[in-house]
UniProtKB/Swiss-Prot annotation:
Keywords attached to this entry: Ribonucleoprotein, Ribosomal protein, RNA-binding, rRNA-binding
PANTHER family xrefs: RIBOSOMAL PROTEIN L25/GLN-TRNA SYNTHETASE, ANTI-CODON-BINDING DOMAIN-CONTAINING PROTEIN, RIBOSOMAL PROTEIN L25_GLN-TRNA SYNTHETASE, ANTI-CODON-BINDING DOMAIN-CONTAINING PROTEIN
Family, similarity comment: Belongs to the bacterial ribosomal protein bL25 family. CTC subfamily.
NCBIfam families (UniProt xref): bL25_bact_ctc, PRK05618.2-1
Pfam (any one): Ribosomal_L25p
Subunit-structure text: Part of the 50S ribosomal subunit; part of the 5S rRNA/L5/L18/L25 subcomplex. Contacts the 5S rRNA. Binds to the 5S rRNA independently of L5 and L18.
Organism: Rhodococcus jostii (strain RHA1)
Descriptive protein name: Large ribosomal subunit protein bL25
Amino acid sequence: MSDENRLVAAVRTEFGKGAARRARRDGQVPAVLYGHGEDPRHLNVPSRDFAAILRAHGTNAILTLDIEGKEQVALTKSVVVHPIRNYIEHADLLVIKKGEKVTVDVPVVVTGEAAAGTLVAQDAATISLEADALHIPEQIEVSVEGLEVGTQILANQLELPKGSTLQADEELLIVNVVAAPTAADLEEETGEAAAEAEAPAEEGAES
């Protein structure tokens, strides 16, 4: 594990919303480390360093935690982000061991350009995989280069990295290539929307 994913974690001795707010004020993220039958450990990790790791490696980032001088490898299992202020409020971390398999949701990224006159609809933003805990793919790419109207890509058609297996429904729709709306279609939709908006106004005037 590279040093860039190393975090010095402090064991929490205070709990509750007030303690969590104080920790965040001090530049720390409250976190819980659990797994392998061990009692959950309540920690604080540096918010700036943790956020940088997530930006670089995604939400399934592997961490090397330094807890009171002892190292523990952990998977970032879930992260709660404030909906307005966009800071990390809390994180759940999972103890992992070398050679262990874990199930994770990995982002799906669409690449390439479909045929002219098409529109690419991405129906699934993530895909559930089982992968080696220390070799989780950051993303799964699916190419739509040159695809024609009517083409669909299902989960079982994705190219997965070696050691990863699909856990999602094999028939899960990932990408659907449809006909792009024409100028006439857009004009018709605009006209219908305007007519719908005028109807309530006319009804109100009559009453």
